[in-house]
Amino acid sequence: MNPIINFILLFSMMAGTILAMTSHHWVYAWLGLELNTLAIIPIISKTHHPRATEASTKYFLIQAISSALFLLSGITNAYLYGTWDINHLSNNFSKILLTIALATKLGLAPVHFWLPEVLQGVPILTALIIATWQKVAPMALLIMTWNLIPTPITLTMGLLSTIIGGLGGLNQTPLRKMMAYSSIAHLGWMVIIITIAPNLTLLNLTLYMIFTSSAMLTMHLTISKTLQNAMHISHHSPIITSLFLLSLLSLGGLPPMSGFSPKWLILQELTLHHLTPLALSMALMALLSLMFYLRATYISTMTLSPSIITLKTTWRLKSVSTTSSLSMLTPPSLLILPIMPLLIQ
């Protein structure tokens, strides 16, 4: 793709996200979401492969339907109450429509079916954008309207997302599909606490983006697409192998990694609000996600590829820019837990 066109698309994608995040008017927020969607469609389909075309078509249809539901929610509220302000949502039907529309854009269960298929059909860097940056605008709108969203719906979606994210990732060998189900499970943790403590949702989203970026940049650097390819990571560099292991363990939420802190705080908040059975269910469902993270770490770091040719370790990494971005993302994904008391005050 032409670098100028690529820059325009990335700039439009960022501008759409910022417009949606900062808007309190229904139409402006909808325009931001649409600009974001239309900018990433050419990025998804730029490889000229049938799977990329299929992924871009699925992504466009799902995002168009969710945008229509979002706009219908605003029009219904404006027709009944005469206001276009997002924070003045008084109709229950509009609240439910808004929740369903944003849940579809995020890929929350039970409207999650598009996310694994789309991520499997795109390159890893494009999958990274879909799994991280494309979650910012819908999640910002959910945080903006946290006091208007029906709590039973968010609790149900959150628990269902952690169950489906954990169960769906157990039998996956493609790494992109595994990261898609990981994204669904993490989104469940964010949504289940959003009407109780929205600041924890924002913290969880920030840490999730750091962890996922670190893991997927390692996959891109080592050209790993499946668990079988992950056996070759140790031939690139022992340091990269160690960073990949620690990033996956942080995604799984094992202490003392940074990924343990948001789960700990969310479980504590649920318990304080007398939702102990729900907190126990979330903790048990987190073990399902931890299972496939541990399987990926075992295969990538403790097993060798059954290759006839003796492979030498590639000590010289290919991309300086990718390595530098990975080196900036990895320390926060490992070392935030000791300073967590300062972050939550």
Curated annotation (Swiss-Prot):
Enzyme Commission code: 7.1.1.2
Stretches that traverse the bilayer: 1-21, 25-45, 60-80, 113-133, 148-168, 191-211, 239-259, 274-294, 324-344
GO CC, alphabetical: mitochondrial inner membrane
Catalysed reactions, as listed in the record: a ubiquinone + NADH + 5 H(+)(in) = a ubiquinol + NAD(+) + 4 H(+)(out)
The name this protein goes by in its record: NADH-ubiquinone oxidoreductase chain 2
Gene, per the UniProt record: MT-ND2
GO annotation (BP), single: mitochondrial electron transport, NADH to ubiquinone
Family: Belongs to the complex I subunit 2 family.
